[in-house]
Amino acid sequence: FTVGSTPDGPGNTQNVGLVVTIGSPVSNAFTARLVQRTLSTCTSASPARISFRSGTQTTGDYAIVTATENVGLTGSVGSTFGFTSAEKGRIYFYAINANPGAANSVIELAIARKAIFDESQLYSTTAEGGAGAADSDTVLYSTSARANVPVRCIGFMDITTGATAGNWSN
């Protein structure tokens, strides 16, 4: 799917797409990637832009952050995100401003089972870790743990888990 508009204010995005690949980088894992609307990797010539709220809770400002390279996150084998075996459900994908307020702000991806993260608030994330231990349905997981970062929900994936919880085979 793609989301597109001109990022001229809070809440807007431009040239944003999301690709989820099951069985990547290994069998029973999945990888989500922030991409251009054309589903190509973001580049400096054709970046994705996302508007985030300020990284300061008491400030109403916003910042437009640009992704100019591959931005991805892997759901590792064994990480259940709160799912049990053979369960239907949804996984939400969030963009986070990993370095709010800095000149070199960076977009990273985060995932959660529940859409409980209000975009007007700041959140701390937990590292997914790659060891199959991301098992809570109410935690926002990212590649690296982050503290007090703005988030934007950029999509979701409907899934049915396999016979073993944490094996992302379908």
What are these regions (language model features)?
Residues 1-170:
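Polar, enzyme-active/binding microenvironments
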